[in-house]
Regions:
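A detector of single, family-specific signature residues
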Residues: 1-241
């Protein structure tokens, strides 16, 4: 809100909680200068802020670069204080919600199987189960992949056959689940990364290779749930779907 441009530039407020905690009590350059780095660091430490001394030092340094009080500073300071409190409350609400989702997910008997697949954590796993239910709506892994927009659909006509295209209508949330899980798994050594690198070597760009990996992992997860077995880097002998 323009109270202290140097203080705004001193931190990435979207990436660290400490500077937001700071703004619940100290919003103006004058208030920060009066507090001083030592007192400010102690205040932050009592509120379990990480690297409290560094946050305090950077804040006071920014405050010392501005000696002028800007018009409307008091009103703007109150607004900053209110917004900081709201952001911290929202952060706590998100943490509580995540915890509830994780707890609910782990009550499902399939949770251990799903979570054993690299990249498929409790949040993505919970979203997957919320969408697919008991999987009774899918005849096989191919149908699940098609629902996620990861398998081509036939557009054969009376004149042409073998005409397959990417589906225009698919469930974007389930596609997101498989895409994000594949992206996470691809970053770690293992079969997912090996498959991704293989597809890149074949000439696919990053997104195409990642979607190919996501499609492959649909088959893997389907087989795991069907057989009620945990993921293993070396697949077991195949059996009919």
């Amino acid at each position: 809100v323009g109270i202290c441009p140097a203080l705004e530039r001193a931190f990435d407020y979207s990436a660290a909680k400490g500077p937001v905690v700071l703004l619940t009590e100290y919003q103006t350059p004058a208030a920060l200068r009066r507090a001083g780095a030592k007192r400010l660091a102690d205040w932050l430490a009592r509120r379990t802020v990480r690297s409290a001394a560094d946050v305090a030092a950077r804040a006071v340094e920014a405050a010392q670069s501005q000696a002028t009080a800007l018009p409307g500073e008091k009103r703007a300071a109150k607004l900053v204080c209110d917004l900081a409190h709201q952001l911290l409350a929202l952060d706590e609400w998100i943490k509580d919600t995540d915890r509830e989702i994780r707890e609910a997910f782990h009550l499902d008997e399939r949770a251990e199987v799903i979570e054993s697949l690299p990249g498929m954590g409790p949040i993505l796993g919970a979203e997957f189960l919320a969408i697919v239910g008991d999987l009774s709506g899918y005849a096989d892994a191919g149908r699940l992949a098609a629902h996620a927009g990861l398998a081509p659909v036939s557009r054969d006509s009376g004149r042409r056959t073998g005409n397959h295209h990417r589906p225009k209508r698919y469930h974007r949330r389930i596609r997101h689940v498989f895409y994000m899980a594949a992206q996470t798994a691809m970053m770690r050594p293992g079969p997912s990364r090996d498959y991704y690198l293989k597809k890149r070597a074949e000439g696919l760009i990053h997104t195409q290779a990642l979607l190919a990996l996501a499609r492959r992992r649909v088959d893997v997860l389907w087989a795991m749930l069907r057989d009620k077995r945990l993921f293993t880097p070396t697949p077991p002998p195949s059996r009919p779907a």
